Amino acid sequence: MVEGESKALWIILATVFAVAAVAPAVHGQQTPCYFVFGDSVFDNGNNNALNTKAKVNYLPYGIDYFQGPTGRFSNGRNIPDVIAELAGFNNPIPPFAGASQAQANIGLNYASGAGGIREETSENMGERISLRQQVNNHFSAIITAAVPLSRLRQCLYTINIGSNDYLNNYFLSPPTLARRLFNPDQYARSLISLYRIYLTQLYVLGARNVALFGIGKIGCTPRIVATLGGGTGCAEEVNQAVIIFNTKLKALVTDFNNKPGAMFTYVDLFSGNAEDFAALGITVGDRSCCTVNPGEELCAANGPVCPDRNKFIFWDNVHTTEVINTVVANAAFNGPIASPFNISQLVN
């Protein structure tokens, strides 16, 4: 996407968010159930009991969330929380870990911090739940609860996965086996091939209304700027690899939309630039809001945080603040960053 188109897209996004901020609340649940898959961007507590570095059930995470620290990788709500609100759910979709059997009739969140498309992704972080395992958990949940296929075909499904396959696999140092075996195009193809398998399994299990979130500009996160960007700017090698993946993911969406009853959509998290958020008063994009110890990416436990959190893009060195999550969720739900459908069309 050229620079002018990117600017226009995010100006529209800002307008959508401004309208959404004053719009009346949705009355009535627009879809019978909502299932969430992915990584730390969507995780809301599935990692809390795991032996992993990728868990955040401590302050200052959740400092602005009504339940406090829950395992969400932000100061407040994450993207699925806001989408659930926009779709008319009275409560956030609960994590699969610890949920009741009956909850599978309403929705579950299977996402896991450090989760990836490839099984070996994030081995450096400890225990995590890969996309393959998340799909298996979904199968177990809906079979145990005997959720009718007719109901599952009406549900909303959102998936955010792939970032860790780059951050905690392909671009790790020293080079991983994947980096030695594949060039960026080959690696993206390997990821999409696996993704296709898991999406096909979900389709067989009833998934018809599916939003696939692309990878954002992870080469511009504080973590990657400090390591691969030389501390001075975005790591373009990382961003270029992400562009290859996202392009193939869009094509995958097109392929699935040729299947009977399928309404798959791609959510573009890449095209916006930090300066585009200035229209919303979100002006700090080069550092985290919370205190992050040298060489780390997550907030230091009980460390100081910035008082003006609505001005920050990044909560820690990788994950975004609640205000950014709200902007993205509104833009994906109402347009304009989702194509060929926005999420409101999937639930209606």
Curated annotation (Swiss-Prot):
What Gene Ontology molecular-function terms does this entry list? cutinase activity
Which keywords does this chain's UniProt record carry?
Glycoprotein, Hydrolase, Lipid degradation, Lipid metabolism, Secreted, Signal
Known EC number: 3.1.1.-
Recorded coiled-coil stretches = none
Q: Which GO terms describe its cellular component?
A: extracellular space; plasma membrane; pollen tube
Where in or outside the cell is it found? Secreted
- Residues the record marks as active site: S40, D316, H319
Q: Which family does it belong to?
A: Belongs to the 'GDSL' lipolytic enzyme family.
The name this protein goes by in its record: GDSL esterase/lipase At4g30140
